[in-house]
C-alpha cells in the first residue's frame, strides 16, 4: 500500500512541477507534450517516469546530453513522501496543492488564491468539529499579527498571510504556532547559508511560502508528537 501511495504521489508531484513551470510561461500544461527544456525534443514515456527516468537516463537528456535540473527528481521524491504520509484522498490533494504553492512562490514570489482555495477546501474536511474553537483560533493566532506587520512594515506579502490563515484553520492554534516556529528556523538557516555562499544579499527578497509550507506539513503530520515530546522534556527539566 505504501508503494502505491508513493507512486501516485510522485506522479502527481511530477505533474504539479510541470504545471507550475508552464504556468509561469503561460503554456498549456494539460494537453501539450513534455519536451527537453534545452533541445526541445519531445520526451517519451521512459524519460518521464518519476524518479526512475532520471536514474535510467543518468540525469541527462537522452537526446542532447544536457543535464536534467535536480528540481525534477527532488520534487518527485518529495511527492512520493507526501503520498506515503497521506491518510486520505483529501490529505493527498492538500499536500500536493501545498507543494504547488511552495514551487510557484519560489519561482514567482506570489501565492495564488486559486491554490489557497484548494487547500482550504481540503483542510475543511480534516477538521474535527469537536475542537472547532481551537481551529478558529488557529486561523488568526499567526495570520493576524502577520497581517498587521504586512500593513505596517511590508515584511510579509498578503499571500503569506492568507496561507497562514488557511493553514491555521486546519492545524489548530498549537500546531499553527509550531509550524510557524519551524518556518522561522528553516527560513533563517537557509537565508544564512545563502548569504554565506553569496547567493543572496541582505536586500534580496526570499520567498516565505516554501518555508511556511514546510512548517505546515511537518506540524500537520507530526505536530502533536513534537509537542508531546517538548512537554515531556520540559517536565523533566531538560
Where are these regions (language model features)?
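Residue-level signature of transmembrane alpha-helical entry/exit and packing/kink sites
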Residues: 1-6, 72, 76, 91, ...
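Hydrophobic alpha-helical transmembrane segments
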Residues: 1-11, 82-87, 126-131, 215-238
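Membrane-proximal soluble regions of multi-pass membrane proteins
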Residues: 16-71, 208
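Long, charge-rich boundary regions
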Residues: 58, 62-122
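Functional transmembrane core segments of multi-pass inner-membrane proteins
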Residues: 93-192, 196, 229-237
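Interfacial loop-to-transmembrane junctions
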Residues: 193-218
